[in-house]
């Protein structure tokens, strides 16, 4: 999504004596990369999913935020961690029950990553990952 957006405003005022018409446009840079998706955690309870497994075009060092929503079941999140070991309700930094959502800011300078797991192999998470262009 990085690129440019054009903001255009056209204003026309009539009926007050002197008609006025003003047009203006401005190019705005959009310095954000974003990816989103829906993932069924089919390896739940055996292998967690690492954050960078979700993204294909944003480097881990460029990621600055993650929106997560538990669409089905219970989602376990481990922050500032790497690896694919399993996470439980006792070891998770954050637990999202079905329907709950959260935004997690990510420190790209000192972040090892993020790991997401589920309580069952049918649990699913919806995600949006934001990164600097």
Predicted region positions:
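Surface-exposed, well-ordered secondary-structure segments
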Residues: 2-4, 40-42, 50-56, 67-77, ...
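C-terminal interaction-tip segments
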Residues: 2-21, 25, 117-133
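Transition segment at domain starts
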Residues: 13-54
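Extracellular and analogous surface-interaction loops
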Residues: 49-60, 104-108
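Short, surface-exposed beta-strand/strand-loop-strand elements in extracellular ectodomains
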Residues: 60-63, 69-90
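Buried hydrophobic-core signal for structured, non-transmembrane domains
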Residues: 63-68, 112-116
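Intrinsically disordered, low-complexity Pro/Gly/Ser/Thr-rich segments with frequent PxxP/GP/PP motifs
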Residues: 88-111
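Noncatalytic modules at the cell exterior or secretory-pathway interfaces
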Residues: 105-123
């Amino acid at each position: 999504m990085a690129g440019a957006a054009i903001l255009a405003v056209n204003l026309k005022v009539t009926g007050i004596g002197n008609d006025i018409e003003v047009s203006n446009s401005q190019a705005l840079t959009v310095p954000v990369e974003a990816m989103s998706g829906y993932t069924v955690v089919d390896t739940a309870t055996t292998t967690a999913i690492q954050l960078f497994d979700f993204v294909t075009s944003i480097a881990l060092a460029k990621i600055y935020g993650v929106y997560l929503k538990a669409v089905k079941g219970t989602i376990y999140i481990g922050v500032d961690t790497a690896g694919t070991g399993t996470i439980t309700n006792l070891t998770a930094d954050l637990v999202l029950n079905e329907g709950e959502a959260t935004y997690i800011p990510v420190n790209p300078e000192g972040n090892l990553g993020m790991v997401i797991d589920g309580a069952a192999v049918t649990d699913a998470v919806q995600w949006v990952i934001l990164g600097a262009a």
